[in-house]
Amino acid sequence: MTYTFIISDESVNADGFVIQTKGIRTERFKKDPVMLYMHAREKGVIGRWDNIRTEGSQLIADAVFDENNPLGKEVKERVDGGFLRSASIGLSVLNYERIDGVDTVTDCELTEVSIVDIPSNRNAVKLFDKRGLIVLSLKESADGDKDLRTQLIEVLKLPATATD
C-alpha cells in the first residue's frame, strides 16, 4: 500500500505565514529522507519518504514505515486506521519576505518530515480521495536547535515566549 501525503503547499498556516514550494530545497533531504514522529528525534527514525515531488504548488511524498521499529509499526497502524493523517515539515529558513501582506518563506532547506497528530497547516494530510497541503512547528527540536524557532518568531513578530 502506498501512503501519499501532501507535506507542504502555499496556504497560510495556523502560524500566519506561507512557505513557497519553489523555495523549498530538497536535495539534501532526498539523500537522507528521515521520517520522525512529532518532530521527536530522541524517539528515532520511524521511516523514510520516497518519491518526493512537486505537483503545482504542493510538495508531495510517499511514506515508507519502518515496521522493525516498534514506534514505526505503531504509527503505521494509526495511519492505516485513519487516526493519524497529517504531516509536518522541519526546515531551516534561509530567506523570507512580506508578500501581499503575508510573511512568506521564499528560501529554505527541508530537514525532516514528521507524522503528526495536529498540523498547523490543515492541508498537510494523507491523500485519500481529496488533495490537501503543510505544517511547520515552532517547537524546539529535540536536539536543542533553536535557530528555526528563533527565526520564525522574528519573521512572525511574535513574543519570544511564543509556543505552538
Please identify what each model-predicted range represents.
Residues 134-163:
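N-terminal leader/targeting segments
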Residues 2-4, 32-33, 50-145:
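Residue microenvironments linked to proteolytic maturation
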Residues 18, 42-45, 103-104:
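Short, solvent-exposed loop/turn motifs
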Residues 27-54:
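SsDNA-processing nucleotidyl-transfer enzymes
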Residues 13-14, 43-45, 96-97:
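Flexible loop/turn segments at secondary-structure boundaries
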Residues 20, 85, 161-163:
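A diffuse structural propensity rather than consistent per-protein peaks
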Residues 11-12, 41-43, 66-69:
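Short, charged/polar surface micro-motifs in flexible loops or helix N-caps
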Residues 1-32, 136:
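Polar/acidic, low-complexity leader/linker segments enriched in S/T/G and N/D
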